[in-house]
Amino acid sequence: MSNTLPVTEFLLSKYYELSNTPATDSSSLFKWLYHKTLSRKQLLISDLSSQKKHAISYDQWNDIASRLDDLTGLSEWKTIDESSLYNYKLLQDLTIRMRHLRTTHDYHRLLYLIRTKWVRNLGNMNNVNLYRHSHTGTKQIIHDYLEESQAVLTALIHQSNMNDHYLLGILQQTRRNIGRTALVLSGGSTFGLFHIGVLAALFESDLMPKVISGSSAGAIVASIFCVHTTQEIPSLLTNVLNMEFNIFNDDNSKSPNENLLIKISRFCQNGTWFNNQPLINTMLSFLGNLTFREAYNKTGKILNITVSPASIYEQPKLLNNLTAPNVLIWSAVCASCSLPGVFPSTPLFEKDPHTGKIKEWGATNLHLSNMKFMDGSVDNDMPISRLSEMFNVDHIIACQVNIHVFPLLKFSNTCVGGEIEKEITARFRNQVTKIFKFFSDETIHFLDILKELEFHPYLMTKLKHLFLQQYSGNVTILPDLSMVGQFHEVLKNPSQLFLLHQTTLGARATWPKISMIQNNCGQEFALDKAITFLKEKIIISSSIKNPLQFYQPRFSEQIKSLSIMDADLPGVDLEESSSNSLSIIKSPNKTAAPGRFPLQPLPSPSSTFNKRKMDMLSPSPSPSTSPQRSKSSFTQQGTRQKANSLSFAIGASSLRLKKSPLKVPSRPQFKKRSSYYNQNMSAEMRKNRKKSGTISSYDVQTNSEDFPIPAIENGSFDNTLFNPSRFPMDAMSAATNDNFMNNSDIFQN
């Protein structure tokens, strides 16, 4: 089988090849007699249902499901918009309005409609009950609304002549209003290999969220996936057969009885059934010494791993590139897999970003030193609330394979969707959900009583967390109940056939949910693509046509080379005062042009502002005339006035512009300083800026009065300071003695 096939098709074909299982049901006498009693239509439906169960790709599965909908008359249900399950009139009205504005090229009204009307669950269109009446898809009006949304975004970014910064700002705010989607993978020991099939199906359908979280076995799969780029994922999935998940240590040279005695002895001595050294070695071979920050910088995926503290007084932690940027991923995975009684609890390790030295996380902190962690599924199998707080996540795709959870969720009415369900089955699910809720509340109350009586309070607290957690999401992917029969494989190293079998089950369980995920996340993913396109367009156009303008004419910054110079300034040097290595760029020494003067120092604002203003009327002192003065002497001077230089930050590098030791004419006197630079006259500053005329393309706001929205995603930022046309020429020279550029947030974004 060639690995040029789609990933899921290759894996499922390989599974049938190794298991000697036919891709279709074999004929039998009973089946032949049963088919004789069916009509031609019923026989065709039966054959298609059998083919659907044994499909080896989503395209094949979806095609068969669509044919079944046509044969059974369910396609007609999709074309009827009227339903009490959602607000179909709202969707109809908004679709018509967007189509009208798009065809009439009224892009400003269209953008206003997007900003004010787009939400994720508009008119309850994400109701799971809308996906129980057909084999695939749902109401046609929902598909029409999402297709029109994509057409609208395409027209805005390709056909409208709007300012790119302005359009980008509106779309970014709309995306924040809609929220993010996160994929959450549960624990489940070797049943966690089920997640591989889920990832393969979502990746092929281009529905992979950026935020991925994993606990225990889910942390293993999520971490391996998140340390590989999008281009590396296909080869990673097709080579899954070559992966050796040597998690549970067994000495193959000894008999099973001898291995059992060793495990019993270890459990009596240490309280654990297995040694975690094979787990550590396996994770090191898969992940290396990558940290959360390094993985995010490499792939752009936000990996989250949950760990539970071994102490009763600590809260569960969600590790990611924000909360634990320097923590080694393999140590977080091993800690998240440390199920009590199975693996010993382990500490976390981090890598020093400067020296690369590996040490225990929090070793310099007395509170965290010698702190150990265990299985993340114990306290927080699905960290939904923390993901919402940190990454604006409001839509969860959950994959649940915990052996004590998914059989109960199969009977829950919150995990339906993607499969046809009769009314009697729905009522049965509802009753089961109520009964489970009753027993769960009673169990929690009983555990609280035992804890108050101080009967093993640590154990009672952990057991209580098992019942208080949320194990499902907006879309929940569950394995078939037949997987319970493989319980004996839970604490064994997976064989190649078992791995392929779990992958096959995961892919097939995901296919019925694809249409739900497409509709729930359609606008979000379309906005992500549009925002990415606009950012690339802005970067390319800015680097070619519109370099960043500073407050002096013809003074520009070349971002790539960090070359900052003014051709009319005599002898400007670029010097780096940080650890990064940058080349020193010198402009040709020229004689100062008439009326032009070298860059002057910018003193910090103080109470002696008026005194400095009067001092400017006197000739400024000439710089040092010693040509042998080394560059290091400039970096060692304490104040900006003494150094006679301008320092500012670009990213992580601190750059310094210094004057060359050339004799230059003194500053001419001027009569009146512009009121714009008086820090105590903010009202007049706004008045002067309003009267200044047109706004350049570098401004965050545009001339449109409908959307005065900043174009910066992580906070507003007035970029008009970079436009020299906003200031008169007499104010240009005055700006050099003011704290005009001494704003820490100017280069922050």
Curated annotation (Swiss-Prot):
It catalyses: a triacylglycerol + H2O = a diacylglycerol + a fatty acid + H(+); 1-(9Z-octadecenoyl)-sn-glycero-3-phosphate + (9Z)-octadecenoyl-CoA = 1,2-di-(9Z-octadecenoyl)-sn-glycero-3-phosphate + CoA; 1-(9Z-octadecenoyl)-sn-glycero-3-phosphate + hexadecanoyl-CoA = 1-hexadecanoyl-2-(9Z-octadecenoyl)-sn-glycero-3-phosphate + CoA. It is an enzyme of class 3 (hydrolase). A motif (GXSXG) lies at residues 214-218. Loses its lipolytic activity in cells lacking nonpolar lipids, but retains its side activity as lysophospholipid acyltransferase. Residues 623-633 have a biased composition (Low complexity). Lipid particle-localized triacylglycerol (TAG) lipase. The lipid droplet/particle is a lipid storage compartment which serves as a depot of energy and building blocks for membrane lipid biosynthesis. Involved in the mobilization of the non-polar storage lipids triacylglycerols (TAGs) from lipid particles by hydrolysis of TAGs, releasing and supplying specific fatty acids to the appropriate metabolic pathways. Also catalyzes the acylation of lysophosphatidic acid (LPA). This is Triacylglycerol lipase 5. It comes from Saccharomyces cerevisiae (strain ATCC 204508 / S288c) (Baker's yeast). The gene is TGL5.
